[in-house]
A protein has these predicted regions:
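Catalytic helix-loop patch of NAD(P)-dependent Rossmann-fold dehydrogenases
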Residues: 78, 82-86, 106-148, 153
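N-terminal Rossmann NAD(P)H-binding glycine-rich loop of SDR-like oxidoreductase domains
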Residues: 3-22
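Glycine-rich Rossmann NAD(P)(H)-binding loop
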Residues: 177-182, 209-216, 264
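NAD(P)-cofactor binding segment of oxidoreductase domains
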Residues: 71-99
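NAD(P)-dependent short-chain dehydrogenase/reductase
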Residues: 136-183, 190, 196
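Mid/C-terminal beta-alpha module of Rossmann-like enzyme folds, strongest
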Residues: 12, 171, 201-247, 252
Length: 281
């Protein structure tokens, strides 16, 4: 029986994989939280990998506090860069497989067309820099790795934009949401299923892939969709990102082109509204 290690087990994606795992009991699933797969302690992480001895690693764990990363660069790079390289090296040396999760924040937002896997990377914040460094080391240490870049992840688990909007729309009569950052949300349950479909596929084709739900929207439009599905009475006002300054810059355009993953792994990618409906169901 093949053993799958899921890092970041209590996060959005790890939690969705946990839900799906019961339907795939041909695998032994190991769900490791930050104490069982210590991505911020490389020496300990190495011994944990040896002890678990996985055949497949889903590296869902990451340092994702985008604004905080600006002042915690060392920690962000340890988790998002150095730990990734260590996992990739372990996987190569032990003839295992790795799916590593990355981000749209490796891009600078200057594009006006959906970004494919070959698009020029140029992160504009520490979080994006650390994730790009992780991608580079991942493929350097193990060229057979699969990296999936995703964006705007949400789920019924953990903290995310959808749950924040639900709370604010219940508490307030009016909220402001930025309307000049464009991309597409990712329902973590869809991404989790895509990852399982990849390991179930007869072929393992390494490299970088993009995955998010279909549709091109702003955060404001996403908030309007949440309002509509939730039946909230709160007024949503679109504002420019310049009116909502944050320590870390965000890319203004980071829509991901999903043609490669759809073609190579024959995946159907749902529209964001369809997936948002599933979360509300």
């Amino acid at each position: 029986m093949k053993k799958i290690l899921v890092t970041g087990a209590t996060g959005q994606l790890g939690s969705e994989l946990s839900v799906l795992s019961s339907s795939y009991n041909q695998y032994e699933w190991i769900f490791a939280d930050r104490t069982q797969a210590t991505l911020d302690d490389l020496e300990l992480l190495e011994s944990q990998l040896k002890e678990i001895n996985p055949n497949i690693v889903f590296n869902c764990g990451a340092y994702t506090a985008v604004d905080k990363a600006e002042s915690e660069k060392y920690l962000a790079f340890t988790v998002n860069h150095l730990a990734v390289g260590l996992i990739a090296k372990y996987v190569r040396e032990n003839n295992a497989k790795l799916i590593h999760i990355s981000t749209d924040y490796v891009f600078d937002g200057s594009s006006s067309v959906a970004l494919d896997e070959e698009a020029k990377t140029n992160p504009i914040n520490v979080y994006g820099e650390s994730k790009l460094a992780g991608e580079i080391d991942c493929l350097k240490e193990n060229s057979e790795s699969i990296i999936i870049r995703t964006s705007w992840v949400y789920s019924k688990f953990g903290n995310n934009f959808v749950k924040t909007m639900q709370r604010l729309m219940q508490e307030r009569d009016e909220i402001n949401v930025v309307n000049d950052q464009i991309g597409s949300p990712t329902y973590a349950a869809d991404l989790a299923q895509a990852m399982i479909n990849i390991i179930e596929s007869p072929e393992w084709i390494s490299g970088i892939y993009n995955y998010s739900n279909e549709g091109e929207i702003s955060w404001y439009e996403f908030a309007e969709s949440i309002k509509e599905l939730g039946g909230y009475n709160c007024k949503v006002r679109g504002i420019p990102s310049s009116s909502y300054p944050t320590p870390a810059k965000r890319p203004s355009y980071s829509l991901l082109n999903k043609e490669k993953i759809k073609t190579v792994y024959n995946l159907e990618v749902p529209n964001y509204k369809e997936s948002l409906r599933k979360m509300f169901a």
